[in-house]
């Protein structure tokens, strides 16, 4: 089947919005921040000849819904379990960036619907908040002043760890891209939720499923380090798969490479 945007009715009036395409073993994708399910469309296109790919649109990034600055990801976990029940067969859950944290939280709550998990550079908290003690506060202050470009620059440099030169391009991006502009406040909510969760390594150590961790050789160092630390506590972790020429956005820049790694992992069951 071709990709169709669907809505699953649930007890929550918001329901669950997702795309569903292909047939075969199920891959359930949880996108990262500042995006929606379309960020993984290229990877899905590589996978659908052999797999059914279901891509949720995280409620945090559904701009028709009210913002939820106090989110703790619990509702997003609810959505994923509702969608897994609707799918009705075991799946491999794939999460990217903050979406990887949501995927981990989903498996921690109840691993039964899943046979495995793929996480691509989850920005887990290890000690101090991601982005430092004042990163989110400073980004929110920029938003309050009507400067979403500055907020995104703070996020990109302090939280993601990109060079300052990249950060200074963010105000330009926000001016010319209305979609990105609309998602900047949601991204800051997302980051604050991650920091609010704190260090969850003990909880993630309870995940017995096979887990494939992905990282890029050109990714900011702290994201690679967080990935390595997570791999050490997961009892079912496979060797970390490093994409030497990629960074944090290989789903867009190298979809065939990401699809190969995900596909090989799914076929291993």
Where are the model-predicted features located?
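Conserved HGGG/HGGXW glycine-rich cap/lid loop of the alpha/beta-hydrolase fold
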Residues: 10-66
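Conserved serine/cysteine hydrolase catalytic core
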Residues: 179-232, 242
């Amino acid at each position: 089947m071709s990709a169709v945007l669907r809505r699953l009715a649930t007890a929550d009036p918001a329901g669950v919005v997702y795309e569903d395409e292909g047939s075969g073993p199920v891959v359930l994708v949880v996108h990262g921040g500042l995006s929606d399910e379309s960020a993984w469309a290229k990877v899905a296109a590589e996978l659908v000849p052999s797999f059914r790919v279901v891509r949720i649109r995280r409620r945090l990034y559904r701009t028709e819904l009210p913002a939820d600055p106090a989110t703790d990801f619990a509702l997003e976990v609810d959505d994923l379990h509702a969608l897994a029940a609707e799918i009705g067969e075991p799946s491999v859950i794939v999460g990217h960036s903050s979406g990887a944290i949501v995927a981990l939280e989903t498996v921690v709550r109840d691993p039964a619907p899943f046979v495995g998990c793929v996480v691509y550079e989850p920005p887990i908290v290890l000690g101090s908040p991601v982005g430092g003690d004042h990163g989110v506060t400073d980004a929110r202050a920029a938003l309050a002043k009507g400067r979403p470009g500055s907020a995104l620059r703070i996020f990109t440099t302090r939280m993601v760890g990109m060079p300052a030169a990249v950060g200074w391009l963010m105000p330009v991006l926000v001016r010319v891209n209305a979609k990105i502009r609309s998602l900047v406040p949601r991204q800051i909510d997302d980051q604050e939720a991650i920091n609010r969760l704190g260090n969850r390594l003990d909880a993630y150590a309870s995940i017995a499923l096979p887990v494939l961790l992905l990282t890029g050789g050109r990714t900011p160092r702290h994201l690679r380090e967080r990935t390595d630390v997570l791999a050490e506590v997961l009892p079912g972790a496979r060797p970390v798969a490093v994409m030497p020429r990629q960074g944090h956005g290989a789903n867009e820049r190298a979809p065939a490479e990401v699809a190969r790694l995900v596909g090989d992992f799914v076929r291993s069951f």
